[in-house]
Amino acid sequence: MFDESYTIKNFDDVLFKAISDEKRRQEEHIELIASENYVSPRVLEAQGSVLTNKYAEGYPGKRYYGGCEFVDVAEELAISRAKLLFGAHYVNVQPHSGSQANAAVMMALLSPGDTFMGMALPHGGHLTHGSKVNFSGKLYHSVEYGVDNNTGLIDYDALEKLALQHKPKLIIAGFSAYSRILDWARFREIADKVGAYLMADIAHVAGLVAVGLYPSPVPYADVVTTTTHKTLRGPRGGLILCKENEEIEKKLNSAVFPGMQGGPLMHVIAAKAVAFAEALLPEFKTYQQQVLANARTMCSVLQSRGYDIVSGGTDNHLLLVDLINKGITGKEADAALGRANITVNKNSVPNDPRSPFVTSGLRLGTPAATTRGFKEREITLLSNWVADVLDNVHDETNISRVKTQVLLLCREFPVYA
């Protein structure tokens, strides 16, 4: 039997130190990676619960194991709350990740070798949207669309021409580094012209969609996928949604289980249920409004400091900084900001001349900093510090000065008080 003395601290000091160090890093560094956020203690509690012990292959009421009556409650709560949150008829909360959700949709709607279209990774897409190094580009024939070289915006006319030329069976509308609003109706129109399914990947903007601050694709897309972290501020996991379509719903259920996965992670599903309940609260919309305000503020400050933003601005939680004209690489910028305790990620920009391991850009996002309590005042300070570091990535005295300021601000706004 187990008792309270069975702690990591008393058993594995190396691992305990790593966890403690990571907790300190999160408290002492400002997180600007657009895909990261901080979950509430309630989400942590659910994910660390005894539900981790339970195998539950199948779906609520139709399990292949006994003893699932209580984990069924958790999954049904997650499903019903997600339906309410997104206005969806069908929800599957079992995918372990956004990539698993995307893979399940492709398994449900495509056969190996079928043609589909997705946004090119260097233009802001995701690995699972057709990258040749990913399953999506290996199992299926992917055709990539991108952004206009001059505007940095999706070229819908060029996308339509590609669709008419290649006749894809599926079109993916979604991104990992695109700062503008997608025209779901235009995507639907293009998909209908070639008889394609339309899948919307809202992994980055799900929280904004949930509160009505970013247009919902649910009325337009055949299937919608998302992660449950990022702007949704839940545990790491995936989610599949769709409007009413019995045939597609059956295919999706079969693709997730038994097609892609065996037993679902019931402790994570419980944590999803908690996060969805939090997202249904009025304060979650207030939070998302601040995420947008902070992103606009950051964009404005960096532009005033002479930094180019791809597409010229942002309509969501992220912005892509183009460093080509500054003569520094994304890798150099990432490392320099890291030394100042500001965490970012290097990112390719459209038509980037450098490799994905080096890049010419930075992707910045405001969800985590906003969760911390930052508003326009703090974001203005922070954005100027970012520019101060980027102005001379080799000035260690200046980087040290910024780090000192960052630490003071972090103490003023702890993550877990």
Swiss-Prot record:
Record-listed N6-(pyridoxal phosphate)lysine modification sites: K230
Task: Reply yes or no: does the keyword Amino-acid biosynthesis apply.
Answer: yes
Q: What is stated as this protein's family in its record?
A: Belongs to the SHMT family.
Q: How does it assemble?
A: Homodimer.
User: Top EC class per UniProt?
Assistant: transferase
Compartments reported by the entry: Cytoplasm
What's the source species for this entry? Answer: Legionella pneumophila (strain Lens)
Classification via Pfam families? SHMT
- Entry's Gene Ontology cellular component terms: cytosol
Q: Which UniProt keywords apply?
A: Amino-acid biosynthesis, Cytoplasm, One-carbon metabolism, Pyridoxal phosphate, Transferase
Q: Which cofactor does it need?
A: pyridoxal 5'-phosphate
Domain of life, per the record? Answer: Bacteria
- The principal location of this protein is cytoplasm
So where does this one cross the membrane? none
**Which EC number(s) are documented for this chain?**
2.1.2.1
- Kindly list the biological process annotations in GO that this record carries: glycine biosynthetic process from serine; tetrahydrofolate interconversion
Name of this protein: Serine hydroxymethyltransferase
Q: Which GO terms describe its molecular function?
A: glycine hydroxymethyltransferase activity; pyridoxal phosphate binding
Q: Tell me the gene name.
A: glyA
Q: Which InterPro entries match?
A: PyrdxlP-dep_Trfase, PyrdxlP-dep_Trfase_major, PyrdxlP-dep_Trfase_small, Ser_HO-MeTrfase, Ser_HO-MeTrfase-like, Ser_HO-MeTrfase_PLP_BS, SHMT-like_dom
Q: Which reaction does it catalyse?
A: (6R)-5,10-methylene-5,6,7,8-tetrahydrofolate + glycine + H2O = (6S)-5,6,7,8-tetrahydrofolate + L-serine
Its biological purpose is as follows: Catalyzes the reversible interconversion of serine and glycine with tetrahydrofolate (THF) serving as the one-carbon carrier. This reaction serves as the major source of one-carbon groups required for the biosynthesis of purines, thymidylate, methionine, and other important biomolecules. Also exhibits THF-independent aldolase activity toward beta-hydroxyamino acids, producing glycine and aldehydes, via a retro-aldol mechanism.
Pathway listed for it is: One-carbon metabolism; tetrahydrofolate interconversion; Amino-acid biosynthesis; glycine biosynthesis; glycine from L-serine: step 1/1
Check the record and name the PROSITE patterns matching this protein.
SHMT
- Binding, (6S)-5,6,7,8-tetrahydrofolate: L121, G125, H126, L127, S355, P356, F357
Record site: Plays an important role in substrate specificity? H229
